[in-house]
Amino acid sequence: MGEVLGRTPSAVAMKLVNFASFDPAHRERNVKGLANAGKGDRAIWDEFHSDWEGLTFESEQAWERLMGTVRTEETEREEDDRPAVTEGERTVRVRLVQRFFREAVLSSYGYSCCICELNLAEMLNASHIIPWSKDEKKRADPRNGLSLCALHDRAFDRGLITMDEKYRVVVAGRVKTENVSELHEVGLLKIEGRRIVLPERFRPDAEALEYHREKVFAG
């Protein structure tokens, strides 16, 4: 990245540390930037921290300009663009937001399911906690995401499972009354009460999980 930007690797690293020093999660870890971190860095942080979609769109476009890459429809189909597009048309903005969200969420969880720890990337989805269609401001926010395998993504999306305030899996009552197959028992019944694996960054937003429990979970 430093070579592309015309900066030394150490200069790029320190700039990123400056931004990290504004992040409450990193401040708890005592991450500190330069003592003279400029007001410009703070202004950029404040602007984009409250607008994940804007940050995503501008940063992804900037990266493509720097790297000279162009996304094709074929390339995008190879990626699992999990959320449904509600605008009726796949605009460039939507594609970039979806791509950023998926990569940010999955990388935060080390490319493994936060429930069962399956680590086959082809079997993973970046699941929105508050559904894509319900809150535009949350669409690109990685804290509104969980890395889930295909089974648990589907169950979470349909309200068959959720997480409590302590990040433990809760299974809907209906799931417990259905005829039990081996997969049903291992994949759903036995995960109840299990604490999900939390990421080092972009920890799931507590208010988003509360929304899921109240509005999505089947109870």
Per-region residue spans from a language model:
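DNA-recognition alpha helix
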Residues: 1-6
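Major-groove recognition helix of helix-turn-helix-like DNA-binding domains
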Residues: 7-23
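C-type cytochrome heme c attachment motif
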Residues: 8, 111-115, 151
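Short Lys/Arg-enriched helix C-cap and helix-to-coil transition segments
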Residues: 24-46
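Charged, alpha-helical interface segments at or near domain boundaries
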Residues: 44-93
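Short, charged surface segments at domain edges that flank catalytic/cofactor-binding sites
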Residues: 75-118, 130-143
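A detector for short metal-coordination/catalytic motifs
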Residues: 100, 118-121, 130-219
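The −1 position to Zn-ligating cysteines in a subset of zinc-ribbon hairpins
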Residues: 112, 125, 148
